[in-house]
Amino acid sequence: MKKLFAALMFSVLPLTAMAAAPAIPLEKVDIDLTDKAAMQDGLKTFTNYCMGCHGAKFQRYERVANDLGIPEEVMMENIVFTDAKIGDHMRIGMQPADAKVWFGAAPPDLTLVARVRGTDWLYNYL
């Protein structure tokens, strides 16, 4: 029985290593964090096209505005489309239960994706 278990483990372990490898090589991305105009454009794109489903619940509007050099009034008029305050987290209105019915699963929060999967993965995903 021990030999059967050992044989099974040695045949299954290599499969798990192959499953963890990326299916395709990721294209490298070079992000210039000092290019405020590009970062502001990315924020606009995210809030207009992604934030309807994907939240950024670990990020605050105020922090984004400060980091990107956006005045509070401009941020509230052009980026925040809800009744949220400048110090609120960037949440979405869609309930997870509704998302599960509509899409089969709740869309993931995107706050920490770059930290967890890396910027190359995120660039290739988008």
Question: Residue ranges of each PLM-predicted region?
Answer:
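A generic alpha-helix preference that emphasizes hydrophobic side chains
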Residues: 14-16, 39, 107
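Electrostatic cytochrome c docking/interface patches
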Residues: 20-44, 55-66, 75
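Solvent-exposed, acidic/flexible segments
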Residues: 32-39, 43, 100-103, 115, ...
